[in-house]
């Protein structure tokens, strides 16, 4: 949240030089507050588990957030009860005339599937096109990052030979960037993906600003300068046991997966893993809600300014 100070306080300019968000008394007196409307497009098979993970992060902000869950796959789910979907999810037709402060598009286990072979690929493109005029800021996670880069920037699918799985170290590139406000210089975050995100590719083919990357030069966190879109290539929402569940699932399926990197104590899958990324995940989502959504969204959502083209 911003700090409120007198208009003429000398510290105002000093802090702004460090990109600290300062709200003067004159601005604060005219600020109107209402709950934020955030739409979550949940593409994960285990929807209830994914809901829990994202809602936990969104609840860590002092801002009041109204959540709407969205699904675009009309096929019968094998992992989520139909009753749950019918009771708590809307279809795109239900909300296409509405505006939202924020949109989160989750990952999906589609890393080895060509885009045009994804059953709901046309619907993904429809939602992203719609979001340009109806959403203040959109956050893409993991596979959704790859999909958005293709749809918005025409970048072909980049696929790794082996799955990247584990907890990796990252470093921030812009210490005063709003989305990385309060981050340690280096931090840990989990990855579970076949998608590849070389930082050089992002720099060469987009105008997006890379805010954090891995030691190997993969982009982890990047965003547009107008804050309308942000991308996180890992899974900061994951629970402590999620990577373990994925690993043992693949073992049982006979896929011979590598043990997730830097995850199990002593690299032994029989040991109980611990989450080493919770503070990072909470801070990332708090920053996104505050600086990318709350501070730039109009009080009256009917006055949305479409600028994403």
Swiss-Prot record:
Catalytic center residues: 142, 235, 237
Metabolic or biological pathway: Amino-acid biosynthesis; L-methionine biosynthesis via de novo pathway; O-succinyl-L-homoserine from L-homoserine: step 1/1
Domain of life: Bacteria
Organism expressing this protein natively: Shigella dysenteriae serotype 1 (strain Sd197)
Record's subunit section: Homodimer.
Name this polypeptide is given: Homoserine O-succinyltransferase
Gene Ontology molecular function, alphabetical: homoserine O-acetyltransferase activity; homoserine O-succinyltransferase activity
GO CC terms of this entry: cytoplasm
Catalysed reactions listed for this entry: L-homoserine + succinyl-CoA = O-succinyl-L-homoserine + CoA
Positions of the record's site feature: Important for acyl-CoA specificity: 111
Pfam families documented for this protein: HTS
Localization per Swiss-Prot or TrEMBL: Cytoplasm
Swiss-Prot/TrEMBL site (Important for substrate specificity) positions: 192
CDD domains (alphabetical): GATase1_HTS (cd03131)
UniProt keywords, alphabetically: Acyltransferase, Amino-acid biosynthesis, Cytoplasm, Methionine biosynthesis, Transferase
Membership in a protein family: Belongs to the MetA family.
Entry binding sites for substrate: 163, 192, 249
């Amino acid at each position: 949240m911003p700090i409120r100070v007198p208009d003429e306080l000398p510290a105002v300019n000093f802090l702004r030089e460090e990109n600290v968000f300062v709200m003067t008394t004159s601005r604060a007196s005219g600020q109107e507050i209402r709950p934020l409307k955030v739409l979550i497009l949940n593409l994960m098979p285990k929807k209830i588990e994914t809901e829990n993970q994202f809602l936990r992060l969104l609840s860590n902000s002092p801002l009041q957030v109204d959540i709407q869950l969205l699904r675009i796959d009309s096929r019968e789910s094998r992992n989520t009860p139909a009753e749950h979907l019918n009771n708590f999810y809307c279809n795109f037709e239900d909300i296409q005339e509405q505006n939202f402060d924020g949109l989160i598009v989750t990952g999906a286990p589609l890393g080895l599937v060509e885009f045009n072979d994804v059953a709901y690929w046309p619907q993904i493109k429809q939602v992203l096109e719609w979001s340009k005029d109806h959403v203040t800021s959109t956050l893409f996670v993991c596979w959704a990052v790859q999909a958005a880069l293709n749809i918005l920037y025409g970048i072909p699918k980049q696929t790794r030979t082996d799955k990247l799985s584990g907890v990796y170290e990252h470093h921030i590139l812009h210490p005063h960037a709003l989305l990385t406000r309060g981050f340690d210089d280096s931090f840990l975050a989990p990855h579970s993906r076949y998608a590849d995100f070389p930082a050089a590719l992002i720099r060469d083919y987009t105008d997006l600003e890379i805010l954090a990357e891995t030691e190997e030069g993969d982009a982890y966190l990047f965003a547009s300068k107008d804050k309308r879109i942000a991308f996180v290539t890992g899974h900061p929402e994951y629970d402590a046991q999620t990577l373990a569940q994925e690993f043992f699932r693949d073992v049982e399926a006979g896929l011979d997966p590598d043990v997730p990197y830097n995850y199990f104590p002593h690299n032994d899958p029989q040991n109980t893993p611990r989450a080493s990324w919770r503070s990072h995940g909470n801070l990332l989502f708090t920053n996104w809600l505050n600086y990318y959504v709350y501070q730039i969204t109009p009080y009256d959502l009917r006055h949305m300014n479409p600028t994403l083209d």
